[in-house]
Amino acid sequence: MSRSPSLPERPHLDLDPEMSDAERLSALRQHFERMVDVNRELDQRLQNADDRHAELVDEVDQMKARNEALKTASYYIATVEELTDDGVIIKQHGNNQEVLTEFAPSLNIDDIEPGDRVAINDSFAVQTVLDDETDARAQAMEVVESPTVTYDDIGGIDEQVREVREAVEQPLENPEMFAEVGIDPPSGVLLYGPPGTGKTMLAKAVANETNASFIKMAGSELVQKFIGEGARLVRDLFKLAAEREPVVVFIDEIDAVASKRTDSKTSGDAEVQRTMMQLLSEMDGFDDRGDIRIIAATNRFDMLDEAILRPGRFDRLIEVPKPAVEGRRHILDIHTRDMNVADDVDLDALAEELDDYSGADIASLTTEAGMFAIRDGRTEVTGADFDAAHEKLSNVDESGTGPISGFTDYQY
């Protein structure tokens, strides 16, 4: 009879006095095996019970922690303004109320400095020091993995590549040379020119070649809906740059946030101008030979405000034009080096024909030529394929619907 419904049946042994020694030995062995099986099952159940007990203890601890958190009063966020002999002056976030208060006994006053973010209770007493606040959007702009673009992937703008490397890479890699010569390196580089000429690729190559951190953003990302958000994002962006130096900051399409100021009274235009003021202030705030280099790019140079173009902010204004015939030939070499090109393809003649083509247009041309070969079931790209691709893009351009239409008289 079992002691408990939850326990296995205890084996019972009845030996007949008339059994022989061999029968008695066999019965004892079978009884022993049943006892071992029952013991093994009890051990497993005990282990399961111990595991369940540990889970329940953990749940109880979590519930106690939640209960304590629910009973704890919420804190307010404030910034330390000044440390005095009478206490600490804080400014509460939200209402900007300034209060003279005290620290909690557990805090060490030597670890607190003006500007620190702190948590205060209902009595305004400082309870704990918080980490520095950085907008998550600014942190997301940091490029963790460098792009794969190299300077060898860029053609037709060798002079521009040299100027960018002088202004961005050399001050980071060899600042002593500038000090010995007695000059300050350019504090910023602005790349301007029509679309598709390699401005963004040049910035990607810098990110790949340099050992510095790389922060990439678009000017439109700084244009925010609510008042002050854009300026705050700019502050956090440059604060992140200061923490990551040496660093290269790349602002693409900067005309979205640095266009000429007007007399417009709309709230949207006013917010864009406030953001630009913060950007101008941050660009002026670094030492000339600091470890922060700024690259910006735009294809609307005519829209930029004069304040952002002055020396001290962007010391080098580098025009990135459409390539000449030698540059087009170099770009064709770059985009066809991995292609299976037939012997009848004359890249020199093709470069002569591609007048007014940008680097992006030439890349599109080589892709179209490859598509014509695939369409015919061939793995080799012939001169006829390039001619067909050229004709196709030219027809698209003339129709006014293609990616290269309207660039002949493009103003920048």
Swiss-Prot record:
Stretches the record annotates as Docks into pockets in the proteasome alpha-ring to cause gate opening: 409-412
Matching SMART domains: AAA
Coiled-coil spans in chain: 28-74
GO cellular component, one term: proteasome-activating nucleotidase complex
Induction: Up-regulated at mRNA and protein levels during transition from exponential to stationary phase.
Cellular compartments annotated: Cytoplasm
Disruption phenotype: Strains lacking panB gene alone display relatively normal growth rate and overall cell yield. Moreover, strains lackings both panA and panB still show robust growth, demonstrating that the PAN proteins are not essential.
Cross-referenced Pfam families: AAA, AAA_lid_3, Prot_ATP_ID_OB_C
GO biological process, one term: proteasomal protein catabolic process
Single GO MF annotation: ATP binding
Record: residues binding ATP: 196-201, 335
Keywords recorded for this protein, A-Z: ATP-binding, Chaperone, Coiled coil, Cytoplasm, Nucleotide-binding, Proteasome
Classification via PANTHER family: 26S PROTEASOME REGULATORY SUBUNIT
UniProt family annotation: Belongs to the AAA ATPase family.
Domain comment (free text): Consists of three main regions, an N-terminal coiled-coil domain that may assist in substrate recognition, an interdomain involved in PAN hexamerization, and a C-terminal ATPase domain of the AAA type.
Assembly: Homohexamer. The hexameric complex has a two-ring architecture resembling a top hat that caps the 20S proteasome core at one or both ends. Upon ATP-binding, the C-terminus of PAN interacts with the alpha-rings of the proteasome core by binding to the intersubunit pockets.
Function: ATPase which is responsible for recognizing, binding, unfolding and translocation of substrate proteins into the archaeal 20S proteasome core particle. Is essential for opening the gate of the 20S proteasome via an interaction with its C-terminus, thereby allowing substrate entry and access to the site of proteolysis. Thus, the C-termini of the proteasomal ATPase function like a 'key in a lock' to induce gate opening and therefore regulate proteolysis.
Name of the protein in its database record: Proteasome-activating nucleotidase 2
